[in-house]
Amino acid sequence: MENNSQNVLKKIEDLKKEVRMLKEENSKTKRNLMWKIRKLEKDKLLIENERTRLDREVKSLRGEIERFRTPPLVIATVTEVLDDHRVAVKSTTGPHFVINYSRFIDRKQLEPGARVALNQQTFSIVDVLPSEKDPVVTGMEVEEKPDVSYEQIGGLEEQVREVKETVELPLKKPELFEKIGIEPPKGVLLYGPPGTGKTLLAKAVAHETNATFIKIVASEFVRKYIGEGARLVRGVFELAKEKSPSIIFIDEIDAVAAKRLKSSTSGDREVQRTLMQLLAELDGFESRGNVGIVAATNRPDILDPALLRPGRFDRFIEVPLPNEDGRREILKIHTSGMALAEEVDIELLARITDGASGADLKAICTEAGMFAIRDERDEVTMADFMDAVDKIMGVEKEEEYKQETGVMFG
């Protein structure tokens, strides 16, 4: 009897162990199944997201195919606006039409001269197009600002101040002029010998202001066929008004603004037509708006008097050859990044380079560096600068230096 009880107890213990093992195995199996379920749910979510993305892409591609199947539109120009949602247009193919336009199109946009797109079958207006722009004109806009600041211009403190007052101040603080009750100046003419920093001043203006900067060399206005130059001038000012506040910089303006003479060739007459268009844009019937003008020339003596009257150019800023103090500042700017020997005397270089322009001084610094590179040296010596002065400005400057110091350079 006792043995039977022990056997029963043993079987019960065995069954308990088996139950525990089954529970553990069941728990482990459950965990595995839950992990697989979560993984499948995650995979399902990824597949659904991919399907959604592919559906959007298919929809986009179908829309692209539909756009390709759409027939091209006809470009026309509005000639007259009539009543009852009708306008008269002239198509690019030649004929004139009286057509309808949708009520969804803004009536104010349909002015004579506006460009519109017409349906090929019904010739109804389906869209109003932006005004046509000459690619030559749009290419004149400076997209990236020059890296020239006013601090990099030496010896022209007075000129910088006047340029700031004339060009920058009306754009940045127009309320000052309203408070005083005067119209801000909108035109400045920079004149002086070549290489004195006129274009550099214009670059600094472009760098310092947030206005649209349009740069053009005046010779680009000179065109082969009659009326092309005037059209280009008109396009430049239209672009400037559209993107105002803006600044137009006309370099070498004497190319189109020379004095008009009685006797002239057909080419001269076309240049004069271009000049008259420029005069009209500078101070014509329509206001220039928030558009500033900066022009530069080496020959102010040959400019047409009509260009020089107030209202077209309000300020005339002379950019002369730098004096000794100016040359010293310019040399300091150009040598600031150079490896100079201790013997280099900037004061002396400023004294012996009388008559040098800012461009000459920059060339002297560059040449001195080239002499050091040629001799495989790590620094620029005074002898290199003297050789550079000799090369850029002539032997007389080196002789002047020898007389001052009694030093000979081989």
UniProtKB/Swiss-Prot annotation:
Statement: the UniProt record of this protein carries the keyword Coiled coil: yes
Q: Which Gene3D superfamilies match?
A: 1.10.8.60, Nucleic acid-binding proteins, P-loop containing nucleotide triphosphate hydrolases
Instruction: List localization entries.
Output: Cytoplasm
Q: Which residues form a coiled coil?
A: 1-70
Q: Main site of residence?
A: cytoplasm
Q: What's in the keyword line of the UniProt record?
A: ATP-binding, Chaperone, Coiled coil, Cytoplasm, Nucleotide-binding, Proteasome
Q: Which domain of life is it from?
A: Archaea
Q: Transmembrane region positions?
A: none
Q: Which HAMAP family match?
A: PAN
User: What exactly does this protein do?
Assistant: ATPase which is responsible for recognizing, binding, unfolding and translocation of substrate proteins into the archaeal 20S proteasome core particle. Is essential for opening the gate of the 20S proteasome via an interaction with its C-terminus, thereby allowing substrate entry and access to the site of proteolysis. Thus, the C-termini of the proteasomal ATPase function like a 'key in a lock' to induce gate opening and therefore regulate proteolysis.
Q: What is this protein called?
A: Proteasome-activating nucleotidase
Q: Which organism is it from?
A: Methanothermobacter thermautotrophicus (strain ATCC 29096 / DSM 1053 / JCM 10044 / NBRC 100330 / Delta H) (Methanobacterium thermoautotrophicum)
Q: What is the lineage of its organism?
A: Archaea, Methanobacteriati, Methanobacteriota, Methanomada group, Methanobacteria
